Every structure is written in structure tokens, then in C-alpha cells.
Amino acid sequence: ETQVIWGVRDFAARFGRKPEGMWLPETAVNIPTLEALAEQGIRFTILAPRQARRVRRYGSRNWKDVSGDRIDPSRAYQLRLPSKKTISLFFYDGPISQGVAFEGLLNDGKRFADRLLGGFSDDRVGPQLSHIATDGESYGHHHHHGEMALTYALRSIESGDVAKLTNYGQFLEMHPPDHWVEIFENTSWSCAHGIERWKSNCGCNSGGHPEWNQEWREPLRHALDWLRDTLAPAFERRGGESLKDPWAARNDYIDVILDRSSEMVAAFLAKHATHELNREERVRTLKLLEMQRHAMLMYTSCGWFFDELSGLETVQVLHYAGRAIHLARKALGEDLAEPFCERLRNAKSNLPDHANGEEIYKKWVAPSVITADKVTGHYAVSGLFEAYGDQTRIYCYDVTREEYSVETEGRVRLAVGSARVRSLITTDENTLGFAVLHLGDHNITGGVREFQDQNRFHELREQLKTAFTQADTAGVIRILDEHFRKSTFSIRSLFRDEQRRIINLILQDALSSATSSIRAMYENQAPLLRFLNSLSVPVPGAFLSVASIALNGQLQQALERPDIDAAAVQGLLREAELNHVNLDATTLEFTMRKRLEEQAAAFEQKPDDLCALKRLHGLLDIAAGLPFHVGLATAQELCFARLAGATANGNALAQAAAANGSRNGNGNTAAPTTQNSDAGQQEWSRELSAVREKLCFHGTT
């Protein structure tokens, strides 16, 4: 019930109206689920054809068996529920959906359109619906350029006179069901055994590792069920101390999830709280509700779908469980981690390195739990590399600086301060003191903890400053160890994205120095390399390595220049070929592609800018001369509308381009003569034709 309510409210918040239909994950269905949909005003959902059991026409008493994918997918059906409510059901076209997902139907937009139209039949009477259900990833991720095939197919159908595009709501409005249907309960579209894929080793898997088993699914399910059933009564009992109806509050908690502002939280608590809550009660109540949120998230279907317990999808559901356990520890005072891990121990990984669910949980989930200490440690370290203001946001935490000072001596820096950390999710606040010592490069050490007595914090600050100003680095480290003991951190304590950014900053100087040295080595040895090549003498591997690093680096820099020198690029390519250097095609292609996309975007914004058009033409020439393929898809998409409409608006655009081209070096416009204007228009047209040709728009007029 809660998840259906959340889905309805989320849709309404984003689109300004209530939804008419709702997709069931994996089309997994039973009657209570359909009752929950109908109760919230959902008119329809979509199922797989094999989930239909039997149908009968309105007014008829004769049921027709349609099991085994034999239902007619071209109409809507009505299902009568035990509550006397009804819900409409659509059953997608199985063969066409299968063709999209697994048979390469998206390789050809025309064939895709024809197949969709082939879903209609002259043997049927009345209006027909041709429709499919597939993963969204099919269009571009699983099938490269699948979104283009979809676009072509929809445009082709829309421009023809055989059918018109519609949606389920409109079709229901125009052609209400005239057949009843009954379904097979506890079935889905992706498990031949009903819904066993989400609780047992039923045999359904990706097929990528036939030697593996999925015996881990059952104990994983049991562990999560135990956690859910342990948290639910505790939530009801403890939540009842501050909430009139904890379960009704959970239903409405979606309003807070969608808007974490203090105003929304206050309005939510005003509606549901038994009394005006103090700060501690408010924080505990929000933690309980967030605990329930994660107790639902941990049932995300992909956690069981794939083959291995240590897969990222399954680890993610364990992360959700870990968050629920962490919140339970804070809000209920109960530590459920060990009994949960005992149950996970029965879930065996197919990979010896991971053993079982307990080891996976302790290796990846437990260390990732975010606390105010970790946020403060992240703030302290990252503050050495970027200037934070008095207030900053780190993910879902607001950090307010209370005190902060930095001492510098050469490459060594010492930062000491305190900050108030507030969770935007639970509104929990902590004020923590920190100190961090950066010895240069990646050598960072520090500590963070709560100081009940501010005088103790100030004493620490003065001790550290004294030791630092006396160049007593060992003394600084000793003081940090004494005051922070186990609450220490390093660059490893940073959240992953920021960790990589800072490591890249640290590496820049080292890389720059190394690259300069290697380039100098190559330039010194280049004549010898040419001589060896002229004699067909094998070049020593060490020389080839130096040449590879130097030439790939120079090419990278050449392609990154604001105005790429085509001759310089060609010269470097010839030199690489002469020295038998393997180009770093992946990195160079990415750089060239991004340059093209940037220039294509500039042309898309200003199609009358002759200079932008010329730069795009030049970049396309350079890309064509590279000894590897450069992807043009995004550049094509950016330019398509402009190129397709260029002929229709050609004169106006050409005149504007000619006028733009007449600007002198001071940015002033000289009045163009008719002759100059004609020449400018002709130049723009030539450039446009060249760009169109190089982007492979041969038929665009």
C-alpha cells in the first residue's frame, strides 16, 4: 500500500496530475497488489501475455482459456476484484517485445515500424492496439542507437495513414473493455517459475555463468524478511510514542522525501505528531521513518535477478539493509547487525574470495555507513584543496564552519577547526572538532571527535600550533594520536568522488614533471630512433615506451588546444607511425569527440556564425584524418535540425553569416558591399555543404 501511495504522490508532484496507470516491477502480480492499485485510483496496469488465464466477453458465461501466451493483446480487459472494484489490464505483444529485446529489431527503424504495424490483423473486428513492453535500456544501452530506430519508427507510423499513436489512457477512454479476464497470480514477465527468481534457485539467470548456482537467493530473502519483520513492530511501538498512527505517517512520508525543507517537515509533524516534539523526539521520529523507507528499498527486484551474491545489484540491497540497521541502532538502541549477518552467512557466494553474505556485508556495506564523524573528516581533508565558505553542502549534509585556521610551512599544512554537521534527512546535528596535517602529496593524517569542553579543543589547537611552528612534525602527529586516538582519518576517508578528484589534483604536479622528463628524453633520442628505423633495426622496448608516452601526450595536448593545428597533428601522426608507436585510441578519440561536440553545440546555438561553421568543418577534417574512428552520433544529433532546415532558411542564414563575417578585427561592422555579401553567402553555403557531407547527411536538403 505504502509504495503505491508513494508512486501516485511522486507522479503528481512531478507532472501536476494523478497517474492513470502504474507499472508493476517485473510485472509481478497478485490480487492484493491489484486491489492496492485500484484503491488508489489506478485505472490500469500492463502484464505479460503468459500471465493471462482466461477471458470472456461481457454478457457471456463462457470462459475461454488463453493460457500459454494465447491472449489477444490488441484490446483492453477488465478484471473484477474481491472488493467489487475493477481494474483494466493490457497484455503487451510478446513476440514483438521479444524481437526488440533479443532479436535485433532495433537495428533497422523501418523494420521496427513494419513489425509494430504487423501487430494488427485483418481477422480481428473493431479497434486494435499494437503495443510492446521492454526495458528502457534497450533503446541505446543494450542496442546501440536503438533510440534512433524508435524515433524513426514512431515518425514513420505517425506520418502514415495505417495507424495513429495513442496511449493507454486515451485508448481506454475511446475503447473501454468489453471482455473480463482472470490472471495467474504470483507470476512475472521475467521468471518462468512465477516469482521464484526472487526467493530461490529456480534456474532463471543471465546464462553468463552456467557453472554457478543461485542458492544464495533463499537465505538472502530470509535475512531481509527477518530484518523487515523485526523492524516493523519496533517501528509501530516506538513510533507510536510520537506519531498518532505510525503507518499512516509512513504513507505520508513521501511528502517529506520529495521536499526535505524545514517547512515541509514541520507541516508533516504538525499533522501526524501526538504532541509538539522536542528536538530529540523529532530526530528519532524521522530516523524511524527513514528506517522504514530503507526497509522497503532493500527489496529492490534487481537484488535477486542476476547470478552472483557479490554483484553490484545485490550489494546495493545490502546497503539499503545496512542503512536500516544503522538507523535502528540510533533510533531504537538495538544492534541488529550481528543477527542479520548470522543469517547472511547461509548465503554462499559462487566466488571463493567472497565466501558468503556475511563477509560481503562486512567488507563493503559496514565500512560505507555514513556518520557525522566521516562527513567532518571529509570536510577537513577536502578543505585543504578547495576554499569552503562559512556554510557548505556535502551530499545530504549541511556543514557550518564554527572555527577554522590554517598554518603553512613550505609544502606542509596544518588545519584545525570545528564544524556543525546537520543531516538534511533526519535533521540530526553534531558539532565536532578536527585537525588535519598535510605533509605533501598523498600524506594526510588527522582526527575528528566531539569536544564536550571547548577549552579542551582550544588547548589542542594551541598545542598543535606550537609544535607546528617549531617544525616538530613528529610532535604534531603525536598530539593528534593522543587527542583523537581511534577517531583518525586520512585521504582514504574521503567519499569516493571527492577522493578521486583530490588524488587527481595531487597527481597533476607529479604527472607534469614526469611527462616533461619523458618528452625531453624522447626529443634527445628521436634522431637515433629515426636512424634505427631507416636501417630497419629493431628499436629497444624502453625507447618505444618513451616514444609512446611522449607522442601520445603531445597528440593529446594538440587536440586540446583551442585552435587545433591540423598540420601539427598530422606531423605527430606521421612520427608515431614512423616509430611504430601504438596510439592511445580510446583517450584520443574521447578528446576529439568532445571537441567536435562542443563545436557542434556552438553551431547549433548560432547557425549564422560563419566562424563557428568553419571551425566545425576544420575539426571534422582533422577527425577524418585520424587513424581511428571518431564517434559522430552526438555531433550529428546537435547539428541535424540546423542542417535539415538550412535550405529552407538558407538565404536569411547566409546573409546573416555574410554580415557576421564582415566584422573587422576590432569587433566593428563594416558595411558589406553587394559583391562581398554575395561572396560571404557563397562561402557559408560551401561550408554548410561540406559539414553536411562530413557528418554523413548526404540526403539532407
Where are these regions (language model features)?
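CE4/NodB-like, metal-dependent polysaccharide N-deacetylase domain
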Residues: 2-24, 117-133
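Acidic, His- and aromatic-enriched active-site or binding-groove loops in soluble protein domains
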Residues: 2-17, 38-81, 156-160, 192-193
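Extended, Lys/Arg-enriched charged tracts that mediate electrostatic binding to polyanionic substrates
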Residues: 50-52, 56-71, 384-412
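Active-site and substrate-binding clefts of carbohydrate-active enzymes
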Residues: 63-386, 408-425, 437-444, 449-513
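Active-site-proximal loop/turn and secondary-structure-junction residues that shape catalytic pockets
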Residues: 26-29, 48-51, 94-96, 136-138
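Asparagine/serine/threonine-enriched low-complexity, disordered tracts
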Residues: 649-651, 660-668, 674-676
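Extended alpha-helical scaffold segments
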Residues: 525-654, 677-701
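Short, solvent-exposed turn/loop segments enriched in Gly/Ser/Thr/Pro and often Arg
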Residues: 21-30, 50, 169-172
